[in-house]
C-alpha cells in the first residue's frame, strides 16, 4: 500500500519570517504558524487551544515569504512533515520535526492574497514566475451591480 505525508494549514504567523541563505545562495525561510481549535466544554464554556507549527520553505518561495509576510499574516501552507537531526552548541544531537512547504498562499487583506507554487523539479532553479489568477468563467463578471430587490 502507498503512503501519504501531506500537511495543510491555515493559520497566522507568530513572528516575522526568518530568512537565511544557504551556501548555494538559495534562500531559506523559517516560519512559526499558529492554528487555534475552539470548542465548547460540557458546561457550555468556549475553550481554545493554540498549536504552533514550525514551517520551512526554500528558494523563490522563501524570498516571497520574507518580502510579503509579517507577524500576524494569515497564510495557507501545503507541505510534508520532515524530521532532521542537528547538533547544538553543546555538541548534543537534537531532532526537529517541521513542515517543509511545497505551496504557500497569502490570505486576508490587500497585503496578502497572492500564491506561489514552486517548480515541480526541486533540483533545478527556482526562477519560475507565479501566474495571475485565471479569469472567472462563471459569467458573473458581466453582470450589473444593481440588484432588483
Curated annotation (Swiss-Prot):
InterPro entries in the cross-refs: NA-bd_OB-fold (IPR012340), Primosome_PriB/ssb (IPR000424), ssDNA-bd (IPR011344)
Disulfide bonds listed in the record: none
CDD domains: SSB_OBF (cd04496)
Domain SSB: 4-108
Keywords of the record: DNA damage, DNA recombination, DNA repair, DNA replication, DNA-binding
Region span, Disordered: 105-149
Segments forming a coiled coil: none
Pfam families: SSB (PF00436)
Residues of the signal peptide: none
Positions of short motif Important for interaction with partner proteins: 144-149
Entry's Gene Ontology molecular function annotations: single-stranded DNA binding
Compositional bias of kind Polar residues: 127-139
Highest taxon listed in the record's lineage: Bacteria
GO BP, one annotated term: DNA replication
Keyword DNA repair listed: yes
Gene3D superfamilies per record: Nucleic acid-binding proteins (2.40.50.140)
GO CC terms: nucleoid
Subunit description: Homotetramer.
Function: Plays an important role in DNA replication, recombination and repair. Binds to ssDNA and to an array of partner proteins to recruit them to their sites of action during DNA metabolism.
Protein name, as recorded: Single-stranded DNA-binding protein
Gene name per UniProt: ssb
